Amino acid sequence: MRRSFHRMFVRVPLLVAFVGAAVVGCGTPDARPANEAGTVTLRLGYFPNVTHAQPIIGLADGTFARELGSDVKLEAKTFNAGPSVIEALFAGAIDASYIGPNPAVAGYVQSGGKDVRIIAGATSGGALLIVKADSGITKAADFSGKRIATPQLGNTQDVAARAWLRQNGLRDRDHGGTVDVRPIANADALALFIKGELQAAWAPEPWATRLILEGNGKTFLDERDVWPGGDFVTTHLIVSAKFLAEHPDTVEKLLRAHVKTTQWINGNPDQAKQIVNAGIRQATGAALPEAVINGAWRNQKTTYDPVASSLRKSADDAFALGYLGDKKPDLSGMYALDPLNRVLKELGLKEVSK
């Protein structure tokens, strides 16, 4: 029976927040398909936005092609939404992709833990609580009776907003409180914010910066300030479990390209921003204004660490909000970090943990 990811995504919206404990490794030799060229085809998905810097840059400068080598045929595909990525992965149309945590976890759960593996992180941070400059909001208690937008019911920012309200003695109306939390698509939230119909928004980049620059907003809280070390996951690199099992050497080559590109980005931020914005323009027809990409870049961190601990904390928040039902699902096999740690060890870098 064909999976319906979109139904799953609505039914279990908060599963982004919960991550299990076990790390899955794979050590079998790379199995090459018997095609006439003797090559492996790797179909890689990504989004043309600022939180997907590694594929945009690594594809543009040839790092991915060089590290994969002549025996791997790389096909890149762009997407605009996480559910579409998971549908493509389920259908066998892609093998790996950069993606946000919510659809990755939901896909893992729907497949019964069989199809999706997180093999690296890509971006941390990049979410802020923005308030209208003239809203009169200066402290947490001032949010009582106000309207706050989040991108989607149960997504990462939605959970963070509702949990933060609880930590500050408030509750959203859905849970018997006085704060009106409204899940609204980012573009629509920006329009309503500009009109003054919203007093606040817990938003990801580049939307947070746009709320400030276009909507007379100001930062009330940078979400990094509520996480240990300021790190929480925004973007992952995932791979199909089947591809990982059949082509572990190819996955390690991809991870080597990912890590090297991450290092280059962090060492050359100004150049990296320009390349990312050029990639966004090529894919979408419009680059981000310089002030927007500069602001968004400051508020996020490019990394290969999946920051798994941040998902465990979010899981506790999601469960407390009642979004995970009476029993937390078993996500114990979702992470496959052994290949990444082998690459990190080879490059003399600190290994990441689950």
Question: Where are the regions that the model predicts?
Answer:
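Pocket-lining segment of extracytoplasmic ligand-binding domains
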Residues: 135, 175-178, 182, 188-280
